C-alpha cells in the first residue's frame, strides 16, 4: 500500500515572537501546500515521530523510543489539546513487530504529547483527530540518547510493519533542525529543577506559564544577539537535508551525538525524528524527496525546514 512522508520543523514561539510578516506568510504557504498533499493522499493512518520537551516524558523513566497506544496532547503554548484517535490494537501490533526486529521500544497506554507532536498534526491535517494516528516518541533532549543509527533502524522496523498493514500511511517527522532553546539539563541542575525534570508531569498553570515566559524571553534575547544559546547553523542544516534527499540514509550512522550538539545545538538531536521517518519510507524501497522550504529563523530559535517524499516508483 502507498506511503507518503512529510517532515517539518516546529516552533512553540509562533505568535509569541515572530519574524517578518512575509516570512510567516511563506511558512504558512508551505504548510498549506503540505496540507493539500495530505488531503489528496487521504491517509488511513498517520504515524508521527516526535520529540518531547519535558512535558510528557521525564527522567523517572526516560525511554529512547516509545509507541503510544493511547495519547493526549497537553496543549502547551498555543498547541492543540485533547485526545488523539489512536488505534490501540494496531499500535500494540506495531510495538510487537518493532521489538521482534530487535529494536527495544517502550509502550505507553497513557502517553502525553506536547507541541512537538500536536503542531505537526495541526499543520498537516488541521486537527488532532482528522485521521487515526500513532505517536512514536523519540528522546531528543534528555541524555543519554540513542544514536542516529538506532533512530534509522527504528524507522526501518516501523516501515516494514506498515508496508504489511494494508493501509495508506502518512509518516511524519517533527523537529529540528539546528536549534538550542533554553531546555534545562539534569547535570548540574538545582534540586528544584532536577525534580521538575524527573517528575514534572501535570504542572500548575502558573508553573507552565512561567516556563513558557522564559522561552519567549530567551527568543527575544537570541534575536537581539544577547544570548549564550548555540547559534543556528544553516550550512549544517542544508548538509543534513541534502543527505536525506540523496537517499543515502545510512550515511547518518556516522553522525555522533557529540557532533550533533557541537554543530547544531543541544536540541538539534530532534533530527532523529526526520531520520526515523525517512527510515520508514526507505523500508518501502527507493524514494524521491523534495525540500520545500528552509530558512534560519532566529525569532523561532530554529533552522526551519519542510520536506516531503514518496516512493520513487509512484
From Swiss-Prot:
Biological processes annotated in GO: 3-phenylpropionate catabolic process
Transmembrane intervals: none
A Pfam family recorded for this sequence: LigB
Pathway annotation: Aromatic compound metabolism; 3-phenylpropanoate degradation
Gene3D superfamilies: LigB-like
GO terms assigned for molecular function: 3-carboxyethylcatechol 2,3-dioxygenase activity; ferrous iron binding
Class of the enzyme per the UniProt entry, highest EC level: oxidoreductase
Keywords assigned by UniProt, alphabetized: Aromatic hydrocarbons catabolism, Dioxygenase, Iron, Oxidoreductase
Top-level taxonomic group: Bacteria
Enzyme Commission code(s) on record: 1.13.11.16
Cofactor or coenzyme needed: Fe(2+)
Active site: 115 (proton donor), 179 (proton acceptor)
Disulfide bond entries: none
Record has Iron as a keyword: yes
Function comment: Catalyzes the non-heme iron(II)-dependent oxidative cleavage of 2,3-dihydroxyphenylpropionic acid and 2,3-dihydroxicinnamic acid into 2-hydroxy-6-ketononadienedioate and 2-hydroxy-6-ketononatrienedioate, respectively.
Quaternary data: Homotetramer.
Designated name of the protein: 2,3-dihydroxyphenylpropionate/2,3-dihydroxicinnamic acid 1,2-dioxygenase
Organism, as annotated: Cupriavidus pinatubonensis (strain JMP 134 / LMG 1197)
Amino acid at each position: 500500500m502507498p506511503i507518503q512522508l512529510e517532515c517539518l520543523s516546529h516552533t512553540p514561539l509562533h505568535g509569541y515572537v515572530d519574524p517578518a510578516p512575509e516570512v510567516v506568510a511563506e511558512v504558512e504557504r508551505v504548510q498549506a501546500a503540505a496540507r493539500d498533499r495530505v488531503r489528496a493522499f487521504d491517509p488511513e493512518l498517520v504515524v508521527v515521530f516526535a520529540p518531547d520537551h519535558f512535558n510528557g516524558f521525564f527522567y523517572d523513566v526516560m525511554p529512547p523510543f516509545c509507541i503510544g497506544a493511547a495519547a493526549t496532547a497537553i496543549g502547551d503554548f498555543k498547541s492543540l489539546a485533547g485526545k488523539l484517535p489512536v488505534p490501540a490494537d494496531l499500535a500494540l501490533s506495531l510495538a510487537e513487530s518493532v521489538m521482534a526486529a530487535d529494536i527495544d521500544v517502550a509502550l505507553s497506554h497513557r502517553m502525553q504529547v506536547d507541541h512537538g507532536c500536536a503542531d505537526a498534526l495541526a499543520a498537516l491535517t488541521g486537527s488532532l483527530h482528522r485521521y487515526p494516528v500513532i505517536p512514536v516518541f523519540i528522546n531528543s533532549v534528555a541524555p543519554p540518547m540513542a544514536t542516529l543509527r538506532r533512530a534509522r533502524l527504528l524507522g526501518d522496523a516501523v516501515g516494514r510493519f506498515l508496508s504489511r498493514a494494508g493501509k495508506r500511511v502518512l509518516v511524519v517527522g517533527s523537529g529540528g533542525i539546528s536549534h538550542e532553546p533554553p531546555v534545562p539539563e539534569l547535570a548540574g541542575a538545582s534540586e528544584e529543577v532536577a525534580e521538575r525534570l524527573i517528575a514534572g508531569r501535570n504542572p500548575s498553570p502558573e508553573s507552565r506559564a512561567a516556563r513558557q515566559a522564559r522561552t519567549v524571553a530567551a527568543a527575544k534575547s537570541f534575536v537581539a544577539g544577547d544570548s549564550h544559546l548555540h547559534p543556528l547553523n544553516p550550512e549544517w542544516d542544508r548538509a543534513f537535508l541534502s543527505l536525506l534527499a540523496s537517499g543515502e540514509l545510512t550515511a547518518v550512522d556516522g553522525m555522533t551525538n557529540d557532533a550533533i550538539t557541537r554543530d547544531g545545538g543541544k536540541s538539534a538531536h530532534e533530527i532523529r525524528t526526520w531520520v526515523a521517518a525517512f527510515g520508514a519510507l526507505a523500508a518501502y524501497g527507493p524514494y524521491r524527496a523534495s525540500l520545500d522550504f528552509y530558512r534560519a529563523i532566529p525569532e523561532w530559535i530554529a533552522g526551519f525546514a519542510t520536506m516531503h517524499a514518496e516512493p520513487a516508483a509512484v
